[in-house]
Amino acid sequence: MTQLLLFLVALLVLGHVPSGRSEFKRCWKGQGACQTYCTRQETYMHLCPDASLCCLSYALKPPPVPKHEYE
């Protein structure tokens, strides 16, 4: 009985397969993450090479470029 329990525990531990996206691809100088969807706390910056979205936290988002008025 003990061996059966040990065998089942070993199967559960060794059989665990992490998801394919456990390591997010990085973008935007390593500060963003390539994801399918951005969360509410993130903003979309550009497309990653695999056509996913580069999501960047609002706290890390660069300030907008000031618009110069042309005469």
From Swiss-Prot:
Signal found in the keyword field: yes
Cystine residue pairs: 27-54, 34-48, 38-55
Subcellular location: Secreted
Keyword terms, alphabetized: Antibiotic, Antimicrobial, Defensin, Disulfide bond, Secreted, Signal
Domain of life: Eukaryota
InterPro entries: Beta_defensin_dom
Functional description taken from the UniProt entry: Has antibacterial activity.
Similarity field: Belongs to the beta-defensin family.
Protein name: Beta-defensin 124
Native organism taxonomy: Eukaryota, Metazoa, Chordata, Craniata, Vertebrata
Underlying gene: DEFB124
